[in-house]
């Protein structure tokens, strides 16, 4: 019988990412999960020989990823982490995930990471991480083909776009090879400085054009606090913009992540329904998998 991890109502921090991160409305571009991700297939994104992107193969590499997560989420963003071990960001899902890391070949330092929960692992655990924040009942029909992304972060000194680009190319290559056409994740909008005004305004701005059909909508377990006023939202954070350009849908209202003082927007990307220019790139990755 599968061991079920009962979803706690403790939220995480900001993606797809994160998927996972937090800051004020005037400093969104400094957020690690919102490093520019314009086109993971573009020709000029040639391999950066200083950086190596790979799936972690041993515990030391996974520990390095957890230390990076702690430095970004706790030290930089002030999140309240409850992993139980000082200096590490970890939870009960980590043991069941594949961990993608980017290392600097000149130093050996891990400078970027993402984690991926595959459908088979989610079945063993009994839930996805997103189940701790949302009621995912309406996604049950696609769960056998749905992988979940999260805990993404990049070292502050490497936020040029190369790290996140390399990770996304590998994530897409892997998911194509493994037959995971649906990618579930969250993009996070900070609430620390404005109490949620930006998050509410983004929801009102984006829901009319980017909300998934009712059959795929999910519901937050902890909704955002109500507001007496809002404002015209600026452009969405870069990571969210990238997802939307690739055809991702917002699955419902954001959840309130108390630990990270942030709003998590649930998003779903269907690799079989990408815009034409992305489909061409995906076909290139598919040939690489043959």
Model-identified regions with their sequence ranges:
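C-terminal "cap" of GNAT-fold acetyltransferases
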Residues: 260-274
